[in-house]
Amino acid sequence: MTGQAERVFELESLKNNEVLRYSSKIVAFTSGKGGTGKTFISVNLAYAISRLNKKVLFIDLDSNLSNANIMLNVVAGKTLYDFFTGRSLLHELITKYEPNLHFIFGDSGKSDYPKPKAEFIGQLFNQIRALQNDYDIVLLDTGAGAGEDVISVLLNADKNILVTTPEPTAVMDAYVIIKFLSSRNYSGEKMVIINKCVDSNDGEVTFNNLSLAANHFLKEKIDLLGEIKYDNTISKTIKAQELFIKKYQRTEVSLQILKTAKRLSEIIQVANINHPNKKSFL
């Protein structure tokens, strides 16, 4: 109990003694349905942004079904399980994958994994914001679906990226996420990545349909961040636990990911020009 009390005291100190100045660095990935390639996109984007000489923190928030560490073939030490059970503070979970790319991994298959409630998400974001000025961008990979834990993360993030595909079910689920955010008066930027496109027209048509529906029925504006082509090599790298953009740098998919990474990096940089750094925990 003494150790737990010390953790709570340290958490409150972080919350009260640090001036958590507003920034626009925290970006959450969501998809609505599974199978859109959200984690593949987010992990490869994180790597691509880090290669642009930007420092990236990636947090895998897929509660008890995390797989970013599996995709990277990394054995995680401490995970978000340790945070949500009060064993560790967030900065103690950081795995330094490369100098400019750090990860906080989740865990999978824990029978006692606590369901992240609103108060836990609030504590999580207090600590994320205490870390954010050590990084140029913080990427959050949420779980599939529209559960309250996922929506809470999206509402707390500065910007959201919806990863969808041309499949009608995926587009509808993306629309539902936008509807949830709209009903909760979320004012952050909402961007879309169309994954698994057959060609450029496929992505354009998909985005236009989603954008028109969001604007007409919800009065919401969404922006196209990128289009990623379907490539059957992707599944091979996932099975081999290899990072696609690192192994196949000259493919069309990798170039599209890099283009999307540059665009996102520029958006974040412009949004944060007037926000200086503060004290570091690292």
Explain the meaning of each model-derived region.
Residues K239-L282:
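NTP-binding/hydrolysis catalytic cores, primarily Walker-type P-loop NTPases
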Residues H216-I245, I257:
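Beta-strand-loop-alpha "switch" segments that mediate conformational coupling across diverse proteins
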